[in-house]
Amino acid sequence: MIVKPDKMIRVVLDTNVLVASVFYRSPFYWLWESFLQKEYELCVTSDILNEYAEVIERRFSINVAESALEQILSSPNIIQSTRYFEWNVIEKDPYDNKFFDCAVAANADFIVSEDKHFNILNRVTFPSVSAIRMEEFKQILQKNKKV
C-alpha cells in the first residue's frame, strides 16, 4: 500500500467502522482518535452524516450522536462532498453505494470497511477506489507517523 507523506490521506469510513470507533473503550478507538488528531481527512456527504447520526443514536444515545457529529463537522480535516453521479457499483448492498460515490467525488484514497461486499471495489478499474480493512488502515497511519 502506498503511503503519501506529502499529503494527508483522504478516506471514507463505512458507518459500522465509524460507529465501532467512537466509544473510548472500544478496541477501535484509535481510528476516532486519529481523526481528532488530524492524521487523515474524513470524506462525507449529507447522506453519510445522516446515517452516522442515526446508527450512533440507535447504538448509544442521541447525546453521543450529536457530540460525534459536532466533532466531525467542526473539524478542519473534514471534506464535505456532493454526489453528482450514482455509480451503483455495489450490487450486494445498494445502500452502500453512497460511500463509493462520496469517495469518487472527494477523490478519496480509500474506503475503510469490514464489510466483504466492498471487496468488489478492488476489481473496479474506473473509477478506481480501494477498499481496505481497519487493520490495514491502521498500518498506513503508523507508517505515515514514521515518515
Descriptions of predicted regions:
Residues 77-111, 116, 120:
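Active-site neighborhoods of divalent-metal-dependent phosphate/nucleic-acid chemistry enzymes
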Residues 14-15, 44-45, 114, 133:
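A secondary-structure boundary/capping signal
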Residues 13, 23, 29-57:
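PIN/NYN-family metal-dependent endoribonuclease catalytic core
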Residues 1-25:
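Metal-dependent nucleic-acid phosphoesterase active-site entry motif
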Residues 34, 102, 123:
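Hydrophobic/aromatic ligand-binding patch that stacks against planar heteroaromatic rings
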Residues 46-73, 140-147:
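Extended, non-globular alpha-helical segments
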Residues 116-147:
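Acidic, PIN/NYN-like endoribonuclease modules and their adjacent C-terminal/linker elements
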Residues 17-18, 48, 117-118:
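Alpha-helix capping/helix-boundary segments
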